[in-house]
Amino acid sequence: VTRSYIFPADRIDDSADGLPPANYPYDWGAGKSNYGMDAGITSNPKYREKLLEALWAIPSYSIAIEPENLFSDETGIYAHAGWHGRKAERNCSLELLPTIDEQEHGFQINAGVRIRGGFSRQPKFPKHGFRFFFRRRYGAKRLKYDLFGGNAAKEFSHIDLRCSQNYAWHHGFNPKALYMRDQFNRDLQFAMGHPSPRGNFRHLYINGHYWGIFNTCERPKAFFGKSYIGGKKENFDVVKIMGGYSEGSRRTYQVFPTDGNMDLWARLDELSQRDLSDLNAYCQMIGVKPDGSRDPKSKRLLDPVNLIDYMLVIFYGGNLDAPISWFGNNRGGNNWYGLMNRTQNKGF
């Protein structure tokens, strides 16, 4: 159990000379390190007070973890961001720090942490996202906390701390960096009446050292479906694109199931390859007869309204790395999920 006390006025000048703080390495694995904020900004009276205000403006997470579990050549998951699965999970303490305005009351929970992401796992990126798993072996089986407010889920088997990659300071200081695009798109989809991962933005400290802004986000797997669509976890099929960087192996971009199986998705994919100007083919996808009445012999495999609204969000948000990826020469998809409860007649 940990209880952290962070004083932003002391943290703003961390590693002003670019050198690592105590117990941190100069580099990790094949990756490159980047510590602290730019001293040219933090020491500038024009920006310093604004930075201090920003560190108080939103709540903060704190991770307490053995440094070697992140940075050592033998066991460090940050040094080997391309590691996947349980072998790449390390125990830690995760805190959401209480705020003086009581916007957050905070929590502490022991968890397993992994690196998350695809392309962003490459060693050339100095900033990686995190995924936290709540298991009996660490303590509580679930995180029970009102992370997102409103009628959002209050119980979680895992959560993500995402960081932008394609358009971000740590990827060529890209001038297109917005940081909010993905969550804005998810919020739009939710506003259009569809289940969508809730999220917010929080600061992160690792062992007391400032690590940047991260996007807390739900992961749309079976537990998400149970929370927002209803039903049992084991009744959900969830599919996504697998790809990105993996240390020691090649990961091609292809669809695979994170929960359940691929049977219904494969059937939907097969139907989508047909001539959909043929009314019968389209009707098979949405489980109706040509007259629009329910077909008891056919299962609804697609929610067309959800798909249409999703594509509107993609176009409006200018997302170039989702159902069709510009980074893949517009020849394939990336960064999407499909979710369906097999016992309900709603489709993916």
Regions found by a protein language model. Give the residues of each.
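Extended, hydrophobic alpha-helical segments in both membrane/secreted and soluble proteins
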Residues: Q189, M311-G328, G332-M340, G347-F348
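A conserved alpha-helical element in kinase catalytic cores
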Residues: G172-H194
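Short, compositionally stereotyped local motifs that mark structural "simplifiers"
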Residues: V1-N91, L96-G112
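ATP-dependent phospho-/nucleotidyl transfer catalytic cores
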Residues: Y145-G172, H209, N215-N319, G328-R331
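Carboxylate/His-rich catalytic cores and anion/metal-binding grooves
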Residues: T2-S4, K87-N151, F156, R198-M262, ...
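Surface-exposed patches in mature extracellular/periplasmic domains of secreted proteins
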Residues: R198-H203, Y282-M285, W326
